[in-house]
Amino acid sequence: MIEQIFQMAQGNEFTIEKVIADENVHFNHMILGKNEGLPEHFSNSNVYMTVLRGNLSITLDDQDTHEYPACSLLKIPMGIKMNVRNLGEETLELIVVKAPAPK
């Protein structure tokens, strides 16, 4: 078999899983319930964030918080302060791709 297969969690429970973390790319899957979020941090690579379901609430650097619905794709440059949260009623599910892979 040439391809590699990776399974991701399903459901509504808080999940942060590193699906792929190699020398080329980091591919992360996240599930956040209402009022859950990530610790504030700085992006350590270019970040491509896809909202699969729910609404993403995100504050970047000193901007106001913005909301993004399912099927939104955000491209965030390296070195940006990020505050990622689920302020909505629905479960938030995201795919986060970091490319190139952080060193």
Predicted regions and their residues:
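Glycine- and acidic-residue-biased ligand/ion/polar-headgroup-sensing regions
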Residues: 45-56, 61
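Conserved short histidine dyad/triad with adjacent acidic residue
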Residues: 26-43
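A short, N-terminal "cap"/entry segment at the start of jelly-roll beta-barrel domains
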Residues: 1-24
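Conserved hydrophobic/aromatic beta-strand scaffold that supports enzyme active sites
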Residues: 18, 27-29, 48, 73-75, ...
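Ligand-binding loop in jelly-roll beta-barrel domains
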Residues: 78-102
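Short acidic-glycine-tyrosine-enriched beta hairpin
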Residues: 63-78
